[in-house]
Amino acid sequence: MAVFTAGALGVDFDLVDLGPLILAPPASATPTSVGLSLLGSTTQIFGSGFTFATAGPPTAGTINRIIVGVDAGLVYDITGLSLSAATFQGWVAAGDNVSAKAGIFGGADQIIGSGVADRLRGFSGDDTITGGAGADFLDGGDGDDDVYGGTGNDIITDSGGSNYLRGDEGDDNLVGGAGFDDINGNMGSDTVSGGLGDDWVVGGRDNDLIFGEDGVDLVYGNLGDDTLDAGNGADTMRGGQGNDSLMGGAGNDYVSGDRGDDTMTGGAGADLFHSFADAGIDRILDFNVAQGDRVILDVGTTFSVAQIGGDTVITMSGGQVILVGISMSSLRTDSIFLG
């Protein structure tokens, strides 16, 4: 398992270029360490059984640590390696940065960002990535990853596996992948997308924009005035506190505005709209009796139903559900029920 720790200067994985090391003459070379200095940076390599050519990194042995720095300070420190020096030297000689990064970070790695903006990637394996402070770009890559944005307005993405993604503080953009993702924007006004798969997608605090996308998703606004779009699939949507907008999309969805004055649409499918006493005033914009839409109220709720203008209005203590454009006479006996 590689442990990558960024220095105070910040790191962009996409700009890391190992190729020039092939030209650097070994300095203070021993069987366990060497320094390679070129173009204003110094790379220190530690391990065992090293042998060397006239230039470049070790040609034989095992590498267990790589430290890269510049005059201004540490760039990054990689520990926990068990890497063939000959393989590493081959990547460097070929200028093959893609294979080098994939090889170094091919396991269950821990990647720790700096206090400024970083661009970090996990590659394959079940990785833990922490962005720290700064506006970071964090990509978990393949595997089942845990990714934490830290403070700052971060972009977090993870294309494969089943992932645990947290925005932490800041206005973050989080995008899940093809598997089951547990995503929470936490603090800040976040944009959160589940991607493919059956996901748990939560906005957290503040006013969030939340997309379930494909799959059977749990989409939850939590605090703030949130906008929720469940996408395709038989989804469960909850607005939480605040005045929320909930859109079910295709599929038989469960839609609950929870507390606050909420606006709800179920989309295609037989949708179940939930409310309760003291929940606020909820408006259902596309209630469709023919599709099988229904309203479920908590057990024990006392309510009345009336036609007010062109709408059917369900009134409870401290709340209403307004079926916009629906005639009360068109409702079925089970269109409104307790459960």
Positions of predicted regions on the chain:
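Acidic, glycine-rich calcium-binding repeat modules characteristic of RTX/beta-roll
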Residues: 1-27, 117-302
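Short, hydrophobic/aromatic-rich segments at coil-to-beta transitions
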Residues: 28-35, 61-65, 252-254, 268-272, ...
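Extended interaction-bearing regions that mediate binding to partners or small molecules
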Residues: 1-85, 100-105
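General beta-strand recognition
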Residues: 44, 274, 294-296, 313, ...
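Low-complexity acidic/polar repeat-biased segments
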Residues: 52-99, 301-339
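Extended, small-residue-rich solenoid/repeat segments and analogous flexible loops
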Residues: 66-123, 130, 139, 148, ...
